[in-house]
């Protein structure tokens, strides 16, 4: 804790505000979302297809709009997009508190996703610009501590509020985002966007997107890293499925413990891992080590049968290694995206990167589900482990080929 306080204090006020902002964003989001499906199915009595539709709309609207959100941040400034995202979440969660019909639920879900697409790229671009090249890695490491703390505390707060009513959960979450919007409107300094000239907006945006699509190092890096997001998501898919197979009706307790282990491992290891890696490893090598650890996380689950004790140990070790691997690579990954952008259109690059990751998660989860349906116990874990090792190999090749060498700065980030 002392190390964290010192690290936070070393940054300027805007960076500190963004870190606290991300903690509150995740608290508000995760106090509600883990319990939404149960509320829709049992509280409102929706059919399973309708529950899937509502949740799917949220994911589609967020992943599909990340690129647009990043583009808007680069064109109009990061602060307006952060404020707009928080305001939209306030409205969306307020609608969820009152909604009883499917059309209103779909609208609320779409607004929830759109809000994330607006503020996520903007927050990261603002933080990258505020920290500067020398301190970007440390800034994103500290940012991730707050990010993970929100993931840990949010569901616990939601569970406590759920004892009252799901409407209370939605209302509190909406109030959190409303408060964030007001506080940041008053306290977050404006960073004017770069001068975009007199070119028509549609033509300028098309040129920006074309620049990103033809940035071969960035496209290859995004493709290589997409597997890491599929692996990280398995805390919510493959590990609970395995827990269900091992523990039946006690799955909820085991899954909750897995989530806690994952968040606590990231919280406890983030700053130490980053400090060690920055002192001993170049950025690309740190990413490779992180990907390797994430692939290795699934190896303990390969044996064909587990008793209860061994099963819990394997699941816990998998969750911890996934968290540590992700913590090791994350700050260097975020820094690499900025470097590959040439410090230009940073929010748009983050938006494109998030969109690619979201597509990978959707396709990867379909594949993982299909692998479980084969009934071959070891197959999902073997494929997941291999994915991590292949991604590590791809990043190694990109680095050796010189693709991850920083590009020269073209225009300083202003948005």
Feature-to-residue mapping (PLM):
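Juxtamembrane intracellular "pre-TM" segments in multi-pass secondary transporters
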Residues: 1-12, 189-221, 415
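Short amphipathic helix-loop junctions that connect adjacent transmembrane helices
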Residues: 34-49, 237-254
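Residue-level signature of mid-helix packing/kink "hotspots" within the transmembrane helices
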Residues: 59-67, 151-152, 263-271, 361-362
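Conserved MFS/SLC helix-loop-helix module at the cytosolic interface between two early adjacent transmembrane helices
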Residues: 63-100
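Helix-to-loop junctions at the C-terminal end of transmembrane segments
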Residues: 65-77, 268-283, 372
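Structural signature of the two symmetry-related core transmembrane helices
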Residues: 80-94, 285-300
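Cytoplasmic helix-loop-helix junction between adjacent transmembrane helices
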Residues: 109-148
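A membrane-interface helix-boundary motif in multi-pass transporters
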Residues: 162-175, 370-388
């Amino acid at each position: 804790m002392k190390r964290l306080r010192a690290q936070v204090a070393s940054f300027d006020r805007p960076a500190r505000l963004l870190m606290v902002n991300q903690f509150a964003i995740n608290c508000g989001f995760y106090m509600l979302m883990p319990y939404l499906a149960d509320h829709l199915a049992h509280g409102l009595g929706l059919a399973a297809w309708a529950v899937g539709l509502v949740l799917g709309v949220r994911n589609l609207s967020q992943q599909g709009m990340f690129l647009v959100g990043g583009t808007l941040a680069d064109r109009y400034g990061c602060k307006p997009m952060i404020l707009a995202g928080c305001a939209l979440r306030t409205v969306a969660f307020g609608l969820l508190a009152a909604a009883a019909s499917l059309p209103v639920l779909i609208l609320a879900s779409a607004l929830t996703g759109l809000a994330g697409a607006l503020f996520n790229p903007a927050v990261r671009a603002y933080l990258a610009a505020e920290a500067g090249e020398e301190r970007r890695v440390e800034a994103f490491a500290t940012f991730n501590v707050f990010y993970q703390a929100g993931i840990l505390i949010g569901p616990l707060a939601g569970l406590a509020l759920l004892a009252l009513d799901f409407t209370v959960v939605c209302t509190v979450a909406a109030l959190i985002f409303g408060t964030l919007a007001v506080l940041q409107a008053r306290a977050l300094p404006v960073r004017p966007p770069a001068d975009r000239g007199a070119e028509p907006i549609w033509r300028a945006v098309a040129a920006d997107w074309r620049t990103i699509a033809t940035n071969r190092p960035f496209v290859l890096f995004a493709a290589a890293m997409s597997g890491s997001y599929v692996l990280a998501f398995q805390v919510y898919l493959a590990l609970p499925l395995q827990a269900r197979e091992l523990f039946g009706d006690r799955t909820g307790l085991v899954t909750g413990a897995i989530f806690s282990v994952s968040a606590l491992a990231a919280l406890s290891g983030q700053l130490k891992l980053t400090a060690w890696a920055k002192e001993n490893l170049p950025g690309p090598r740190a990413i490779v080590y992180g990907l390797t650890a994430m692939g290795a996380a699934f190896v303990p689950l390969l044996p064909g049968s587990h008793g209860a004790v061994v099963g819990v140990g394997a699941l816990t070790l998998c969750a911890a290694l996934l968290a540590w691997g992700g913590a090791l690579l994350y700050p260097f990954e975020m820094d690499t995206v900025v470097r590959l952008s040439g410090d230009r259109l940073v929010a748009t690059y983050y938006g494109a990167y998030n969109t690619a990751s979201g597509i990978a998660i959707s396709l990867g989860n379909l594949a993982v589900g299909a692998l479980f349906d084969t009934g071959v116990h070891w197959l999902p874990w073997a494929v997941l482990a291999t994915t991590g090792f292949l991604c590590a190999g791809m990043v190694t090749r990109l680095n050796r080929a010189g693709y991850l060498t920083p590009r020269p700065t073209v225009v300083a980030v202003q948005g």
